[in-house]
């Protein structure tokens, strides 16, 4: 889908506004809001749907199916990071596909659970699905208000060094958090420092089967990723057999997460069928589609009933950090792929799309979602033409929920851990230290502060980084570089 579609719509919207300039102010505003161009601005599907072709349909089907095979195993794994039962990863993976198809302005981006959002959620929900779903609803409300009031500029307060510091710390935290599943060790604390301590303290409890399977899965995933990155495009005169082999290799490399998880599940089933307890399995999961219902605004526990006020107090800073980071992650990805593929996105419309996805997602037991860089890259590389590919991806997830949930019992936790570890490895940018040192040494301070403090508490790391970054900015603004030009020098120049 070319960027010209959006450019024509912007011109049409401006023309319709100019036609109303001769009317009264209220009539002018009403005319602007009710014009067809304004409706198309709020419903971007109307921009590309009239031009939809069979060629686009073919490419969107391929892209949607490929992303679907990627998101199912990732969703199961990310639910583990969020501290929720694995089915909640799938509950969070389909609503964004349908909502974004109607409201999104990027042809490439896919919404769903991500490693970073899962880690953020785990910091606030304490393994409680009720907290997770209510957090999703409140995040959606906050994001929609941000979009309606055009408050997207607030994202600029999180500077590049702060964002990079958080992402690098998150990559280490998420990756090390899965070491316990690779080793087959249980009941490890969630806090990072305690996690490191108790993992090494109880390393003697390592299960050989889990370690062996986990390392093999990691090796296969890395090899398949390497093969995909080094595949060359076939020449026109290449034989049919060679083209077929290249296509098969490309498919397996692209859907490597699904291939590895499925293969590991088959191996685990064989061992379990022979009464051999070799691997730590995912275990029983809820069957079928999630019920469509509003989130619970209170929760009954064994000792007390938690009110809406109690839950929001427990969520605390998460009500600010999670919606803000979700918007920042998604919009950064959308802008990057829009620039790469030569089209523009509407930032405020993107914010509304993400917000509405989270609001509606809370009605199907989703936890907060955002744009996924990995799946967006897959979507773009497989030739998606419109957001319609999301309909196929969402359908794949729904079919998995409807028919495959009993089979997820046999998925080893070590296999899911390997998927997560390989997904977060590229998130750690080891070159960022050198880049910041060369470009602007002072930016290393907020980067390092955010990076270090995020190992203690994520929200403290982000807030501390933003505050320090703001102080540095104010310091530079308050001390501008002024050059004094003497009058004698001016005469000499003349």
Each predicted region: which residue ranges?
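Transmembrane helical cores of multi-pass ion-transport proteins
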Residues: 2-488
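Solvent-exposed, non-transmembrane loop/terminal regulatory segments of multi-pass membrane proteins
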Residues: 488-494
């Amino acid at each position: 889908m070319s960027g010209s579609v959006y450019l024509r719509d912007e011109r049409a919207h401006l023309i319709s506004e100019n036609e109303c300039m001769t009317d009264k102010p209220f009539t002018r505003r009403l005319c602007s809001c009710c014009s067809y161009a304004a409706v198309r601005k709020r419903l971007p599907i109307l921009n590309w749907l009239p031009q939809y072709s069979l060629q686009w349909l073919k490419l969107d089907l391929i892209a949607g199916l490929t992303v679907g095979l990627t998101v199912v195993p990732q969703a199961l794994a990310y639910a583990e990071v969020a501290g929720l039962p694995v089915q909640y990863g799938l509950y969070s993976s389909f609503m964004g596909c349908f909502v974004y198809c109607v409201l999104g302005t990027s042809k490439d981006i896919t919404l769903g659970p991500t490693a970073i959002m899962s880690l953020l959620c785990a910091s606030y929900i304490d393994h409680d699905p009720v907290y997770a779903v209510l957090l999703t609803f409140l995040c959606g409300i906050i994001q929609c208000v941000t979009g309606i009031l055009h408050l997207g500029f607030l994202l600029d307060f999180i500077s590049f060094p702060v964002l990079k510091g958080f992402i690098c710390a998150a990559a280490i935290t998420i990756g090390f958090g899965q070491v316990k599943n690779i080793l087959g060790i249980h009941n490890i604390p969630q806090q990072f420092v305690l996690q490191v301590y108790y993992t090494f303290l109880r390393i003697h409890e390592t299960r050989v089967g889990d370690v062996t399977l986990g390392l093999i899965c990691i090796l296969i995933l890395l090899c398949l990723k390497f093969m995909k990155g080094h595949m060359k495009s076939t020449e026109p005169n290449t034989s049919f057999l060679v083209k077929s082999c290249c296509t098969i290799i490309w498919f397996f490399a692209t859907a490597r997460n699904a291939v590895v998880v499925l293969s590991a599940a088959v191996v685990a089933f064989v061992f379990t069928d022979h009464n051999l307890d070799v691997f730590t399995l995912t275990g029983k999961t809820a069957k079928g589609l999630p019920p469509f219902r509003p989130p619970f605004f209170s929760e009954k526990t064994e000792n007390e009933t938690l009110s809406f006020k109690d839950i929001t107090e427990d969520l605390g800073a998460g009500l600010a950090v999670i919606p803000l980071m979700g918007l920042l992650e998604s919009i950064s990805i959308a802008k990057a792929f829009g620039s790469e593929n030569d089209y523009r996105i509407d930032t405020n419309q993107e914010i509304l799309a993400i917000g509405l996805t989270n609001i509606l997602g809370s009605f199907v037991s989703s936890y907060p979602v955002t744009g996924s860089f990995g799946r967006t890259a897959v979507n773009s590389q497989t030739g998606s033409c419109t957001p319609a590919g999301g309909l196929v991806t969402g359908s794949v997830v729904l079919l998995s929920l409807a028919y495959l949930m009993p089979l997820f019992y046999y998925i080893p936790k070590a296999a899911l851990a390997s998927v997560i570890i390989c997904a977060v490895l590229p998130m750690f940018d080891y070159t960022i230290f050198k880049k910041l040192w060369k470009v602007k040494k002072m930016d290393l301070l907020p980067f390092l502060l955010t990076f270090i403090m995020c190992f203690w508490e994520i929200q403290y790391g982000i807030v501390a980084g933003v505050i320090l970054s703001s102080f540095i900015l104010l310091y530079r603004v308050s001390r501008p570089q002024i050059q004094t030009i003497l009058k004698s020098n001016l005469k000499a120049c003349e």
